[in-house]
């Protein structure tokens, strides 16, 4: 398999769960749990990229490699662009971006996302899974993605896409039957050189409107290959309820 590294963007501020990166999960901070889970993949290296000294200290205390970045980043991708320079990663090296609030992420998904980047010879790859719940289709916190026939992303949105117009007109809570509805999984693969290119791209209006950093890539004309996972991954941690659920999982391990 082609060599890749995992970079984990981590910040302390969180509107819905303040300080969640350092939230205790069965004796270890969440960001450490994420890094340890990522280390189970085939990654040659796992590094946390942060702007907060408390996260740096926590990672170092648990033997996790960490790099400090600016506190001015508005997205994890631009943070990783800075980190890749600080780490002197070669432009061709594949970087997998694993979110810092995914302590249950499957190592196999990390590996597969890196493989999809290589197989499709694109600048960026990500993943999605089929969605079968109408409430999730309508939920703006569940990001949806629609694909073209080559399995590249056409668009990502918090809105319900594709929109089941006829069903909704008829007052029915039915999912579209003509095609699968896909929920985006927040994992990305790209080469270190493309991270630098991303950071130099102008911010797109769609990215700002939807608050979705990947839309910058589509706006500037680059394809994003999408792997459809066979099953939904474990949910990340956005709320106290999510954190309680994850803690319960680790207590049984």
Swiss-Prot record:
InterPro entries, per the entry: Cytidylyl_trans, KdsB, Nucleotide-diphossugar_trans
GO annotation terms (biological process): CMP-keto-3-deoxy-D-manno-octulosonic acid biosynthetic process; lipopolysaccharide biosynthetic process
Superkingdom, natural source: Bacteria
UniProt catalytic activity: 3-deoxy-alpha-D-manno-oct-2-ulosonate + CTP = CMP-3-deoxy-beta-D-manno-octulosonate + diphosphate
Pfam families cross-referenced by the UniProt entry: CTP_transf_3
Function, in words: Activates KDO (a required 8-carbon sugar) for incorporation into bacterial lipopolysaccharide in Gram-negative bacteria.
Family: Belongs to the KdsB family.
Protein known as: 3-deoxy-manno-octulosonate cytidylyltransferase
Organism in which the protein naturally occurs: Neisseria meningitidis serogroup B (strain ATCC BAA-335 / MC58)
